[in-house]
Amino acid sequence: MRSYLRGGRSMVYWLTLPTPRSEGFGRVYRAVNAAIRRAGKRVGEGVRVIDLVPVFTPGGRFRQNVTFRGRTVSARQPDGVHLSTAGASIAATLVIDRLRADRALPRLR
């Protein structure tokens, strides 16, 4: 993460991985997410971890369908790992919201 900060001249946005259907992969994803969170805290200033887990896998459990801002969609591909187009749109919205909160993007009027 530090290498992407370019000496403090930029921001780093890192996304956690939503829990997949497979419990075996789930253990790996939880370890990866814990490492992402630790690294983000250790580096500190200039790093934002955007946590997708609460939206896509509330309670850390796989969900095919999620409700986001009042709309329920099938958020995952049939493989139980990848996001569907609707799921990717939700993830993009979360990233855009964070960028706007950081004033890295203009707010909509």
Label each PLM-derived region with a short phrase.
Residues 1-2, 33:
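Generic structural signal for well-ordered alpha-helices
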Residues 3-4, 38:
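Alpha-helical scaffold elements within enzyme catalytic domains, especially in hydrolases
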Residues 6-11:
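A short helix->loop->beta-strand "cap" motif at the edges of active sites that frequently abuts
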Residues 13-15:
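Structural beta-sheet core signal
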Residues 20-109:
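Catalytic His-Asp segment of secreted/periplasmic serine-dependent ester chemistry enzymes
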